[in-house]
Swiss-Prot record:
Domain Response regulatory: 631-745
Gene: cikA
Organism domain of life: Bacteria
Segments of this protein annotated with the region PsR domain, bind KaiB(fs): 604-750
Protein name stated in the entry: Circadian input-output histidine kinase CikA
PROSITE patterns reported in the protein's UniProt record: HIS_KIN, PHYTOCHROME_2, RESPONSE_REGULATORY
Residue numbers spanned by region N-terminal domain: 1-173
Length: 750
C-alpha cells in the first residue's frame, strides 16, 4: 500500500506531453472557476545544479504547476533530463504540497490556499486530473512504456552521460571526485530518489575453535561494508551515508556475490514482495524509505569492490532494460577509474619510496664525503704537527752536531765546557725525539687494541713519591711550588693496576701542569680512594683553558689555537695518549678550567681484577696446575727472545725445545708431541705449520701460541679460524707470558 504522501504518478515523458499537462492544469482551473487557482512557474535557481567545472553537470529546467481548490490540491512537477524529455511527478498529498510551498518560499500561493481542503460535493479535482491525464497519455501513445522516439532519446542521453564519465576518468586522478560526480549525475539521469555506492571491506580469515586436540578449521573471510558515496533527489530523502551493513539482515544480499561477480545487474521492483520472507531486511530497507532498487556490481581485479545501488522511495518502480544496462555500464567504468586510482597510488608510493631512498643515499654519500674530507684534513693536520714536532729536536741535533764537526777541523779547539753543553743538548733533544716517537707508536697501539695491561699490586704512596721526585727538578728550575696531597691511610695503600701506565699518566699530567703554570705558581697532586677506585687529581694555578677548547683537548693533533697549546710539547698526542691509558684501565678523565682560574684534571682508575702476585706465588700456581704433558716447542729465529722464553718456562718446570725456523717443524712436532707450541714468524709460514698440525690425528690437540709485534683484530680473527689458539705481543712481558701459558695449559682439550 502506498504511503499517504507518495506521488500517484512518476514517469519519464516527452517535453511535448509535459507541456500539454501544464496547459491542462491551467484549463482545468479556468473551467472550474469558483475558488480554483493555478500557479505555474520555474523553480528558484537554488534548486538547479551549482555551477562548476565538472563535465557531468548540465543546466536543469525544473518547472511546476500547482492547482488549488477548496476541495483538493494538486502539484505537477517536471524536471528536464534531456533536451526533449522530462521526469514528471504528480501528487495530491497535502503534507508534500505544504512542504513544497514553504521550501520554495511562495508566499502568494500560501495566502491563496485554504487552511484545510473542504470536502467537495461534486467530482473532485483529483478525479478530473486523473481522467485528463489518462486522455493525454493515451493520445500521445505513451502508456506504460516509452515510445520508440523516447527510447532513442534516452539511449542517446545515456551514451552522452557515459562519455562524460569516461572523459572525467581520463582527466582526473581524484577517485573521490570522480565517484561523487558520477553518483550525482546518474541519480539525476535515472530520476531516482537516492543513488549510493556501497563499498565492501574484507576481514582476514580466522580459525574456527574446535574441541580439544582438534585442529582448528580456517573460517572464510567475512565481508562487510558501508555506504561511502550518495546522491539524493531532495533533503527529505533520508541519508544512508556511512551506514554499515547488518550481517543478519543482509545475508540474502551476500548470497548474490557470485552472481554479482559475473556482472549481473539485479532489479527489484518492490522490496515488500521480493523480500517478503525476510522481515529483518524489509524492515531495514523501509527504515530508509526504500521501496524499489536497482543494483549493479563494481568489480575490481576479479574482486567485488562494491555495489552501485539506485533507490526508489515510497512506491514501486518497474525498471527498464535500458536503465539496467546503463547502470551496469556505469559500474564497469567506475571500476576502471578505481583500478586507475589504485595504480596511481602505487606509482606514487613507489615514487615516494624512491625519493626517500635517493634522499637517504644522498645523505649517506654526503656524510661519506664529509668524513673523507675530515679524514683528509686530519691527515694533513697530523702531518703538519708531527713534522713540526719532530723537526724541532732534529734541527737542534743536526745543528749542534754540525758545529762540533766543524770545530774538529779548526786550528783552535772548542772549549770542553762548550762541547759538553752541545753534547748534553744533543742528548736531551734525542731523548725528546725518542719520547715523541714512542708516544705516537703507543697511541697507535692503544687505538688498534694491541696493548694489554700488566697489572700487579703496588703502593700508591710509593708511586706518588716517585713521580713527584722525578719532576721536582723541573719545578725548582721554573720556580713552581710542587706539592703532594696524599689522603689515603697506610692500611689502604695497596692498589692493583698497571703501575708503569699509571706512572706515565701522572707524569704526563704533572709535566703539562708545570709547563702550563707560570713562575711562583702552584701544582698539586692529590690522591684519594673511593670504594674500589683510586682518584688522581692534578691542580694548577695557570692561565686556564677556554670552554670552547675543552671538547678537543683529548684529541690527537688538534690545534686549540691559543697560548695553551704552546705549553704541550708532546707532539700533539700527550693528553690523547693519557686518555687512552685511563680508558684501558676502565676509568675516565675529566677537566675543569676557565681562563685565569687554573685547571683541574681528575682521573678515576678502578681496582683491576688481577690479584696481587709474587714470583714465588706464580711459580706455586704453575706447579699446582701443571698438566701431564709439560713439553713446549718454541719456534723463534731471534736468539735473545728464544733464550728468554726457554729460561722462563724451564724455571716453571716446562720441558722446552727450541727450533730456529718452521723448516721440518711439522715432523719435529709429530715426533716430540708437545702440549704447547710457541711460534714466531711470517703469518703464511705459521698458518701453514698450524694447518698441518691440526690435520694430523696424532697432534691435532696441540695448542698453538703465536708471537707477533703487532696484530689487528681482523688479522687475529683470520688466524684464529686457521687453528691458532692464542697470541702475545712483543716485547715480551715475562709475568704475562707465564699467565698466558698457564691459562692455555689449564683449558680442556679441544
Amino acid at each position: 500500500m502506498l504511503p499517504a504522501f507518495s506521488p500517484i504518478f512518476r514517469r519519464l515523458l516527452p517535453a511535448v506531453t509535459f507541456e500539454r499537462l501544464l496547459r491542462f492544469w491551467r484549463t482545468l482551473a479556468q473551467q472550474t472557476g469558483d475558488g480554483v487557482q493555478c500557479f505555474v512557474g520555474d523553480l528558484p535557481s537554488s534548486l538547479k545544479p551549482p555551477p562548476g567545472p565538472s563535465v557531468l553537470e548540465a543546466e536543469v529546467d525544473h518547472r511546476f504547476a500547482l492547482l488549488v481548490s477548496p476541495g483538493q490540491w494538486a502539484l505537477l512537477e517536471g524536471e528536464q533530463i534531456s533536451p526533449h524529455h522530462y521526469a514528471v511527478s504528480i501528487t495530491f498529498a497535502q503534507g508534500i504540497i505544504e512542504d513544497f510551498i514553504q521550501k520554495q518560499n511562495l508566499p502568494v500561493v500560501a495566502e491563496a490556499m485554504p487552511h484545510r481542503p473542504e470536502t467537495p460535493s461534486g467530482p473532485t479535482i483529483a478525479e478530473q486530473l486523473t481522467l485528463g491525464l489518462l486522455e493525454i497519455l493515451n493520445s500521445d501513445s505513451t502508456s506504460f512504456s516509452p515510445e520508440p522516439s523516447l527510447q532513442d532519446s534516452l539511449q542517446a542521453s545515456q551514451v552522452k552521460l557515459l562519455s562524460q564519465v569516461i572523459a572525467q576518468i581520463r582527466q582526473s586522478l581524484d577517485l573521490s571526485e570522480i565517484l561523487n560526480n558520477a553518483v550525482t549525475a546518474v541519480q539525476k539521469f535515472l530520476f531516482v530518489d537516492r543513488l549510493v555506492i556501497y563499498q565492501f571491506h574484507y576481514s582476514q580469515p580466522s580459525l574456527t575453535p574446535l574441541e580439544e586436540n582438534q585442529i582448528p578449521a580456517p573460517r572464510p573471510r567475512q565481508q562487510y561494508g558501508e555506504v561511502t558515496y550518495e546522491a539524493r533527489r531532495s533533503p527529505e530523502i533520508d541519508t544512508m551515508l556511512g551506514i554499515m551493513t547488518e550481517n543478519d539482515c543482509f545475508s540474502q544480499v551476500f548470497s548474490y556475490e557470485q552472481k554479482y561477480l559475473k556482472g549481473a545487474v539485479v532489479a527489484v521492483s518492490d522490496i515488500e514482495n521480493h523480500y517478503s520472507s525476510s522481515y529483518c531486511l524489509v524492515g531495514l530497507l523501509q527504515r530508509y524509505q526504500v521501496r524499489a532498487k536497482l543494483v549493479a556490481p563494481i568489480i575490481v581485479e576479479g574482486q567485488l569492490w562494491g555495489l552501485l545501488i539506485a533507490h526508489q522511495c515510497h512506491h514501486p518502480r518497474q525498471w527498464l532494460d535500458s536503465e539496467k544496462n546503463f547502470l551496469g555500464q556505469i559500474g564497469e567504468h567506475l571500476a576502471v577509474a578505481i583500478v586507475q586510482s589504485l595504480l596511481y597510488s602505487e606509482v606514487q608510493k613507489q615514487k615516494n619510496n624512491f625519493e626517500k631512498r635517493v634522499i637517504e643515499r644522498t645523505k649517506e654519500l654526503r656524510d661519506t664525503l664529509m668524513a673523507a674530507q675530515a679524514a683528509n684534513l686530519l691527515k694533513s693536520q697530523f702531518i703538519n704537527n708531527i713534522s713540526h714536532e719532530l723537526r724541532t729536536p732534529l734541527t737542534s741535533i743536526i745543528g749542534l752536531s754540525a758545529t762540533l764537526l766543524r770545530w774538529f777541523d779548526h786550528p783552535a779547539s772548542l772549549p770542553p765546557a762548550k762541547q759538553q753543553y752541545y753534547l748534553l743538548n744533543i742528548q736531551e733533544n734525542g731523548k725528546k725525539l725518542l719520547d715523541q716517537i714512542n708516544s705516537i707508536i703507543q697511541l697507535s697501539q692503544l687505538e688498534s687494541g694491541q696493548t694489554a695491561l700488566n697489572c700487579q699490586s703496588f703502593s700508591l704512596h710509593t708511586l706518588a713519591q716517585t713521580v713527584i721526585h722525578s719532576l721536582l727538578g723541573v719545578a725548582i728550575k721554573q720556580q713552581i711550588n710542587l706539592e703532594l696531597d696524599y689522603q689515603i691511610n697506610v692500611g689502604q695503600d695497596q692498589f692493583c693496576a698497571d703501575q708503569e701506565r699509571l706512572d706515565q699518566i701522572l707524569t704526563q699530567l704533572l709535566n703539562n701542569a708545570l709547563k702550563f703554570t707560570p713562575a711562583e705558581g702552584t701544582v698539586i697532586l692529590r690522591i684519594w680512594k673511593e670504594s674500589n677506585q683510586a682518584i688522581f687529581q692534578v691542580e694548577d694555578t695557570g692561565i686556564g683553558i677556554n670552554e670552547q677548547q675543552l671538547p678537543v683537548l683529548f684529541e690527537a693533533f688538534k690545534v686549540a689555537g691559543d697560548s695553551y697549546t704552546s705549553f704541550y710539547e708532546t707532539g700533539g698526542v700527550g693528553l690523547a695518549l693519557t686518555k687512552q691509558l685511563v680508558e684501558l684501565h676502565g676509568g675516565y678523565i675529566e677537566v675543569e678550567s676557565s681562563p685565569g682560574q687554573g685547571t683541574i684534571f681528575t682521573t678515576v682508575i678502578p681496582q683491576q681484577n688481577f690479584p696481587p702476585t709474587t714470583k714465588g706465588q706464580v711459580q706455586d700456581k704453575l706447579d699446582a696446575a701443571m698438566p701431564f704433558n709439560s713439553s713446549v716447542i718454541v719456534i723463534e729465529q731471534d736468539e735473545e727472545i728464544a733464550t728468554l722464553i726457554c729460561e722462563l718456562l724451564t724455571v716453571a718446570n716446562y720441558q722446552v725445545i727450541w727450533l730456529i725456523d718452521t723448516t721440518n717443524a711439522l715432523q719435529q712436532v709429530e715426533l716430540l708431541q708437545p702440549g704447547l707450541i710457541i711460534v714466531d714468524g711470517d703469518f703464511v709460514d705459521v698458518t701453514e705449520v698450524t694447518r698441518g698440525i691440526k690435520k694430523s690425528r696424532r697432534i691435532s690437540k696441540v695448542t698453538v701460541f703465536l708471537l707477533s709485534e703487532s696484530l689487528s683484530s681482523a688479522e687475529w680473527q683470520a688466524l684464529s679460524q686457521k687453528g691458532i689458539d692464542d697470541y702475545l705481543l712483543k716485547p715480551l712481558q715475562p709475568e704475562l707470558l707465564l699467565q698466558r701459558v698457564q691459562s692455555i695449559q689449564q683449558e680442556p682439550l679441544r
